[in-house]
Structures are given as C-alpha cells and as structure tokens.
Amino acid sequence: MGVWQAKALEAGRERATHLYMADTNFVPAKFSDPDVTAKGETRASVGWTGLKTLWLNTGTLCNIECANCYIESSPTNDRLVYLTRADVRPFLEEIDGTVEIGITGGEPFMCPEILGIMEDVMSRGHSLLLLTNAMRPMMRPRLQQGLEALAAQYGPRMVLRVSLDSHDPAIHDAERGAGAFEEACKGLRWLGERGVQVALAGRQALNEDDSTARAAYGALAASLGLKLNPADTKHLVLFPEMIARDDPPEITTDCWGILGKSADDIMCANQRMVIRRKGAGRATVTACTLLVDDPAFELGETLAEATADPVKLNHPWCASFCVLGGGSCSA
C-alpha cells in the first residue's frame, strides 16, 4: 500500500465520527468504509480508463459568496491557494497527446497568473474549458485584453462556461447576491460581441423538468445575442441540485446493472483535478472537482500516482451527484 492509499484509508476511518465542513460535506457514518457498505455489500469503485479532462482549481477565493457553492468559495476562503504556471506545467508535461483542460475555482479570473496558465494549456494543443461567473474580475481591462488576444489566436479551442444558477434573475440573485444576474449578463454580452466561445452552466430546479429548463435558458441566451443551442449539453449543462446534509443510498457493485449504468461513465473514470492547499509545498491531485476537503479523495502528487488505483465511491456526493444525478463537470 502506497503512502497516498494509506492516507486515504485512515481518512475513511476518521470520517465515521467527523463532519467535513458541516453542511456541504456532511458524510454519514455508513460511508466510512471504502470497501463495504453498511449492509455488508461490496462498495462500488471506479477504475481509471484514461485521461479525458484534467481540471485545474485556481483557488477557492472568489469575488462573491454563493449560498450553495459546491466547495464554499468566497472572498475570504483561501484554503486552496492560487495556482501558478510553475504548479501547472509538471502536470501538463505528464500528459500524452491532447486532452481537455478544465479550469475552475473559486473565480479563475482572480488568479494572478490565469492568462499565462491559459496560454500554457492551449500552446500545447489542448482544448480549454474555463468556468467563470463572468463578473468584475473578468471585466478588468488587463483580462479583457488578454482574453481577446487568446480568442484571436486559439479560437474555438477556448470555451468559457458561465455559471447562471437560474434563468430567473430573482432566483440567481438570491443565490449570488443582488445585481449578480445583471452583471453576469453584461459579461456574457461582452464575450458574445467579441466572438469568444461561450457555454452556460445552470441548475435544474427540483420542481423543473429538463426540457422546461433548457427552453428558458435558451430564450435567455438568445436575448443576449449568444449563439448557443440549449439542447446541446456542451452548450448548456444542467447540474443536479445538491441537498445539504443529504443521505443518499450507497452505491454497490450490483447497482451498475440495476441502474443500467457503467463505472466507465462516472467522472472519476477519466478526470482528475489539480489543487494546492494553503501551506502545502506543492500541488496535488484529487479524484474529482467536488471533493477537495476530504483527504480520502486526495490521491497523489502526480497524475501517475493519482490514477494508479480505483476510486472508492464512499461519499454521498458520489451517489447523489455522479451516479444517481448523472453529473459531470467536463464538456
């Protein structure tokens, strides 16, 4: 057993009696054993199938504090610090061929070296998917000039996915603060006018079906002058609502057949994320984009380490977001 696998096992034991970030990372005791469920059944795991998307988390600092942010980003949360070009380059050098590189946060456009990181990614031939709220950090003159230059050089290989928690301004602002919807729309118009490739990330309300949500987001996109097909999941991704302190069923090996799903389709089969913790000597790799606070899902200091062993699905979000919710952060 390697050092990182030993750390993950110990973290699993500790979770039986601890809560990680009491609401959003509430972990019921039944998820504490990485191999066996509370009923004694074999817990499902996901093996590595090859890199589709490498995520770079530029840090948890954000210009706003959303009520239900998946990783609780805010103007004061710096538990994940800004990535630098020096942090990122070793991971890019590990990659064979070209893949999708995703950049998330926090708000990536607050990262001081974000334009250089984007250049390093695309100059190697990778496609880039950057997640942003399209608000004031992106609209600073230095960032605007840099984005226009990158768009002119790399064209459709650069996609900015803008987060809109609802197509309804009141609901969006209740999540992100008064005026947030209008400010995001201003950023979207600016991107569209300059020919930057844009996608949207929304949330499907619990009382709203997929087709209704897509039609409403499509109407909004059209009003902003965006060339976006709401039926295309690459243009509009709708994430399942995450319920704080949710207690979903555990996923066993038998669930794949029962649900008609494959482990190969789960995010951690082909995606990983690079983070750097505050005070850490170097960047490390997590199993996915959501579980950055749980040490059981911090898998190593290189992509080779972080893809050596299957990921055990012993977290409620593995069930509610990925397996049952069908969520994936990549395009």
Say what each PLM segment does:
Residues 98-102, 154-164, 179-248:
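Conserved C-terminal portion of the radical SAM core fold
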Residues 50-54, 67, 158-160, 234-235, ...:
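A generic secondary-structure signal marking the coil-to-beta-strand transition
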